[in-house]
A protein has these predicted regions:
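FAD-site-proximal beta/loop scaffold in flavoenzymes
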Residues: 28-95
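C-terminal auxiliary extensions adjacent to catalytic cores
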Residues: 136-188
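A conserved short coil-to-beta-strand element within the FAD-binding core of flavoproteins
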Residues: 2-18
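A structured beta-alpha segment of the ubiquitous adenosine-cofactor-binding alpha/beta core
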Residues: 10, 22-26
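Glycine-rich beta-alpha junction loops
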Residues: 10, 32-40, 123, 128-132
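A conserved FAD-binding loop/helix module that cradles the flavin
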Residues: 80-122, 126, 136
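FAD-binding beta-loop-beta segment adjacent to the flavin cofactor pocket
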Residues: 57-75, 130-149
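Hydrophobic residues embedded in beta-strands of well-ordered beta-sheets
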Residues: 18-20, 133-134
Length: 188
């Protein structure tokens, strides 16, 4: 059985006994524990002084270019940024952000107009076993009037809760193909 305890603040994990200790709630013993620390910008971003949002947890950016709002000509993307509403923190999203940032940098270096209407796509696959998978997908459009990205209405997609095994196996094949393509694209 899997239990999510999002309202529990973990203060310690005893790997020897498999026990999670919480700030308020009683200790929980489990066979497998996946304790996740609070997310925040990475140490490189913090040491560079770029973490200027949400009490220093995240880096603010101009979403049109992904230029830092704390340092001119420095671009930040991926897990370190303060995300727009509905924007996931995923490798696919970081890859899409990098493309928008790279295009903006090239435009700025050449004195061209930065693309005023960038779009981002996202797909996240989660393997539920060695062959079966579920997914979530979305498209995000830059909204100039609000200076942020918004999820495009109707663009989201998630695996149905009632998927048959042959469908989740097909999604597993899609996930493998997606992984090969995103790695090739990212490392090209």
């Amino acid at each position: 059985m899997i239990e999510y305890r999002g309202d529990h603040k973990v203060t310690a994990v005893d790997a020897q006994t498999g026990t999670s200790k919480f700030e308020i709630q009683e200790d929980v013993k489990a066979t497998v524990i996946n304790a996740l620390p609070n997310m925040r910008a990475g140490l490189v971003a913090v040491n560079a002084g770029l973490n200027n949002m949400a009490n220093g947890r995240w880096c603010g950016v101009n979403y049109l270019t992904f230029e830092s709002t704390a340092a001119k000509d420095v671009h930040v993307l991926g897990d370190s940024i303060q995300i727009a509403a509905g924007m996931p923190k995923s490798g696919h999203m970081a890859n899409a952000q990098a493309k928008v940032a790279a295009a903006a940098i090239v435009a700025q270096l050449n004195g061209w107009e930065v693309n005023p209407n960038p779009m981002l796509t996202n797909t996240c696959y989660s393997m539920v076993d060695a062959k079966n998978c579920i997914h979530v997908a979305s498209v995000h459009q830059y909204v100039a009037a609000e200076k942020t990205f918004k999820t495009v209405a109707g663009s989201g997609g998630v695996s149905s809760i009632d998927l048959k095994p042959e469908v989740t196996m097909l999604e597993g094949a899609y996930a493998e193909s997606w992984a090969q393509n995103i790695w090739a694209d990212t490392l090209a």
